[in-house]
């Protein structure tokens, strides 16, 4: 497997790098209907036009891959976007530059909220995080949120 490819992390949710996110063949092959881009570059009109022509719903979030960045400000909007599309059976692609840190953090956030917080589990937050991270890394071994994002996830859900 090349990690430029799209990787399915769980049903209807995929992760990739930036280059794959603009590859029409890959998007069609995986029937991607919604995309979250979490990047530092501004969206280009060509990409927006392609997504619109292909009836792909997109959410653009701007964030550097630095431990000091506040990724939690995007937890609610990304969760709601993914959840809305999953409920209608759409395939969602979440990507950043490399498909390693920012995008994986948003997917882990979704899984933590959906299956543990809303599910009412009594497990410790750190254990839940490690379990979900392990699942994601089995699917895509290069997944590795930076230390700041890891801490943000644990702290955010420790308060819930």
Residue positions per predicted region:
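Cysteine-based protein phosphatase catalytic domain of the PTP/DSP
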Residues: 2-92, 112-155
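A phosphate-binding catalytic loop at a beta-strand-loop-alpha-helix junction
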Residues: 91-108
